[in-house]
Design a protein with these regions (language model features):
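ATP-dependent small-molecule kinase catalytic core of the GHMP/sugar-kinase superfamily
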Residues: 62-92
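DPxDG-like acidic metal-binding loop motif
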Residues: 18-74
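N-terminal subdomain of lithium-sensitive/metallo-dependent phosphomonoesterases centered on the IMPase/IPPase/PAP
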Residues: 1-29, 193
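Short loop/edge segments at beta-strand edges and connector loops
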Residues: 9-11, 80, 124
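Short helix-loop capping/hinge motifs at secondary-structure junctions, enriched
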Residues: 53, 75-78, 82-84, 163, ...
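An extended, acidic
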Residues: 87-200
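Residue-level signal for inorganic ion chemistry
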Residues: 7, 32, 61, 70, ...
Length: 200
């Protein structure tokens, strides 16, 4: 129906630069191991870009029947209810979402950061983890993931005061697997100072 649109996705090695044309970024099952082993905590994700500009994102938490959507010109909602922008709280009253291996190996100081928080949650799905960031249930999410894992949350998060950066504080390339952090802009300097990634 849209022959001039492109797809970026993990399945079938579908690749197209999000900066070129109209691009749909798709992840039909995020959290595959959770899906197989537990039958829950997996997500369906989609994002849409025009010439590199994110127009909207969608994360569907299947087992909880929660649909997160919006971003760009659209309000971000969960099952139709508007989500508020990030509301600052002391770090020691917040939880962190993370890749288990990166946390246990203190990758780029991640465990150092976690020591200043209430605790760490390893959920096994980027989509589930980042949707909980959007709801204010997690301060941020840290993992090594690909564009189809983070595109939807990036678009929605920008609308709510979050940013997606590499673990060294750089913009993402939207082309490869990278170690990323999805964090509130308001806490960025503080978080990066604990990680040792803040630019001088």
């Amino acid at each position: 129906a849209y022959p001039d649109d492109f797809i970026l996705g993990e399945e079938n090695d579908l690749y197209h630069d999000v900066k070129e044309g109209r691009v749909w970024v798709l992840d039909p099952i995020d959290g595959t191991v959770n899906f197989i082993a537990q039958g829950r905590d997996f997500a369906v994700m989609m994002a849409y870009y025009e010439e590199g500009i994110g127009k909207f994102g969608l994360i569907y938490d299947v087992s909880s029947d929660l649909l997160f959507c919006g971003g760009g010109p659209f309000q971000v909602t969960c099952n139709g209810q508007p989500l508020p922008a990030y509301q600052p709280r002391p770090l020691n009253r917040q939880l962190l979402g993370a890749n288990g291996s990166m946390y246990t190996n203190n990758y780029r100081g991640l465990a150092n950061l976690a020591s200043h928080l209430l605790g760490v949650r390893v959920l096994g799905s980027a989509g589930i983890s980042m949707s909980r960031v959007l709801k204010g249930q997690l301060l941020g999410y840290f993992s090594s993931i690909s564009p189809w894992d983070y595109a939807a949350a990036s678009i929605m998060g920008e609308k709510l005061g979050y940013q997606l950066l590499t673990m060294t504080g750089e913009p993402l390339d939207y082309k490869s697997r990278q170690a990323v952090m999805f964090i509130p802009q308001a806490e960025s300097d503080k978080i990066q100072s604990y990680l040792g990634s803040r630019k001088r």
